[in-house]
Every structure is written in C-alpha cells, then in structure tokens.
From Swiss-Prot:
An MF annotation (GO) of this entry: rRNA binding
Annotated organism of origin: Maricaulis maris (strain MCS10)
Pfam annotation, one family: Ribosomal_L4
Coiled-coil residue spans: none
A GO CC annotation given for this chain: ribosome
Protein name (database record): Large ribosomal subunit protein uL4
Keyword Glycosyltransferase: no
Database matches in HAMAP family: Ribosomal_uL4_B
Family per record: Belongs to the universal ribosomal protein uL4 family.
GO biological process, any: translation
Assembly notes: Part of the 50S ribosomal subunit.
Signal sequence coordinates: none
Residue ranges of the region described as Disordered: 63-94
Length: 211
C-alpha cells in the first residue's frame, strides 16, 4: 500500500510503499501484543527485593519454655516466622524476572503493533528527522503543523544529534534509531512517526523472507 510522505514543514514529499506483511495485518491480536509487552517489562524489572529468612536472623536457638505441661506449642528458636523479629516465611528473593519469548513471536508482535498504528491512522511518514540546529521551539512548531503532540519518532540507523537534543525538551516525544523499534514504545505513544530510512530498515528486518 502507498502512504504519503511529509516534510517537517508539513509539505508533501511524495509517497512510499509499505509492505502489507509488515503494516497491513487486518486482525490485530491484542493477546500477542500483551505477551511481548509483558516480556519487555519483565526484563527491565529490577528484582532486587529481599527479606531475611529464618536462617538469616541472628536470634537465639535455645529452646524456651517447658517442653511439656505448659499447654503451648514447643519452640526451638526465636527466629521462627511466627515471632516478632523472626524471619520471613517464603519472602521475596533477589532474582531475575526475565523470561524467554521466541524471536518469531517478538517479530510478529512488532508487525501487529505497526499494523495497529496504521489501522488507527496514527502513523506518519516524514522524509527525514534532521535539524540544522538543536532548537526545541522550531521542532515544536513543526510537530504542531503535523498535528503531533504525543509520539514516538523512529529515525534511520542513527539519530540526528540536533534533532535528539531538540526533542528531549518536549514532553511525550521519544526518539529512537530504527534498531531500537519495539512494541512497548510503539504502543505507549499516540502517534508513530517514521522516516523513509526507518521504513526501509523495518522492511529489511520484518519482511516475510526474514521473519
């Protein structure tokens, strides 16, 4: 399918062909998107939570109270979980929350996310994401002309330094190189902005032959 290309000045810059296998999926699977997002968020979770267990509490191990005739349970250590100051039973431990997800599932999830943006008419293609000077005001004006206020901008192989500096002062605007494209960042912003170079790299990465 063809989609029009704009400049940062909101002028026409021709059109570009989008691969239907990447951008044209009609039935977007929300369950697949959820799997990929959960995989991404699990990998970034710290997992540094920790409580002291029974064996890590420095309290007396001497038996206290009578063993018989007291009418109460027998206790062999003050570090037992039922006592104040005792160890935590089955408490959290330092661990990694990351889990595996097949590469084909991740690639399919990214294709569904891109198709969802195109289907919702929230995909904008620009010819280039570059500025002569790192001026936030100029970039804000350009985005206003394109009707963009909350967006993820995907550049080519590298992000233009002036563009990145200007964009980082704008709230709700994220800028990533094409290799950093991911499902979570695509879905968390209202609009997806791709450069022509980014589209070419996405096609090379997610085309049917490579998937």
């Amino acid at each position: 399918m063809k989609i029009e290309v704009k400049t940062l000045a909101a002028k026409d810059a021709g059109a570009i062909d989008l691969d239907d296998a990447v951008f044209g999926i009609e039935e977007v699977r929300s369950d697949l998107l959820q799997r990929v997002v959960k995989w991404q968020l699990a990998a970034r979770q710290q997992g540094t939570h920790k409580t002291l267990g029974r064996s890590e509490i420095n309290r007396t191990k001497k038996r206290f109270g009578r063993q018989k005739g007291g009418g109460t349970a027998r206790h062999g250590a003050r570090s037992a979980p039922q006592f104040v100051g005792g160890g935590k039973a089955h408490g959290p431990r330092v661990r990694s929350h990351a889990h595996e997800l097949p590469k084909k599932v991740r690639a399919l999830g990214l294709r569904h996310a891109l198709s969802a943006k195109l289907g919702a008419k929230s995909l904008v293609i620009i010819d280039d994401a570059a500025l002569d000077a790192p001026q936030t005001k100029a970039l804000r004006t350009s985005f206003e002309g394109l009707g963009i206020s909350n967006a993820l901008v995907i550049s080519g192989a590298e992000v233009n330094e002036n563009f990145a500096k200007a964009a980082r002062n704008l709230p709700c605007i994220d800028v990533l190189p094409a290799q950093g494209l991911n499902v979570y960042d695509v879905l968390r912003r209202d609009t997806l902005v791709l450069t022509k170079a980014a589209v070419e790299q996405i096609h090379a990465r997610l085309s049917a032959k490579e998937a």
